[in-house]
């Protein structure tokens, strides 16, 4: 499912116009992104948690040349599914 399909599904499920649903979906994405950028967590009971995980700097290799490459430290978004979501997918 891509973003347009998600907007259509939200519009149908919630009885909204596609424009209103697109605004709602964009708002959710913006809030999640802003919270994670500020290193916050978003915990949605029964659905899952969005968190930020820190990856330490490490050494890598260029597969073509074999030269050693420094890979800088960075923060990466992480999603951990909740029990309700796991049960829904497996049930």
Swiss-Prot record:
Region (Disordered): 57-91
UniProt GO MF annotations: DNA binding; structural constituent of chromatin
Key words of the record: DNA condensation, DNA-binding
Record-linked Pfam families: Bac_DNA_binding
DNA-binding recorded as keyword: yes
CDD domains, A to Z: HU
A GO biological-process term: chromosome condensation
This protein's record includes keyword DNA-binding: yes
Top-level taxon: Bacteria
Entry similarity comment: Belongs to the bacterial histone-like protein family.
Function: Histone-like DNA-binding protein which is capable of wrapping DNA to stabilize it, and thus to prevent its denaturation under extreme environmental conditions. Binds to nod promoters and induces DNA binding.
PANTHER family (alphabetical): DNA-BINDING PROTEIN HU (PTHR33175), DNA-BINDING PROTEIN HU-BETA (PTHR33175:SF3)
Protein name per its UniProtKB record: DNA-binding protein HRL53
Protein species of origin: Rhizobium leguminosarum
């Amino acid at each position: 499912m891509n973003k347009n399909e998600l907007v259509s599904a939200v519009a149908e499920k919630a009885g909204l116009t596609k424009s209103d649903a697109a605004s709602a979906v964009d708002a959710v994405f913006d809030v999640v992104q802003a919270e994670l950028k500020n290193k916050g967590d978003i915990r949605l009971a029964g659905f899952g948690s969005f968190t930020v995980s820190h990856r330490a700097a490490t050494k890598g290799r260029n597969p073509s040349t074999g030269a050693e490459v420094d890979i800088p430290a960075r923060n990466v978004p992480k999603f951990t599914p909740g029990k309700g979501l796991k049960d829904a997918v497996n049930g």
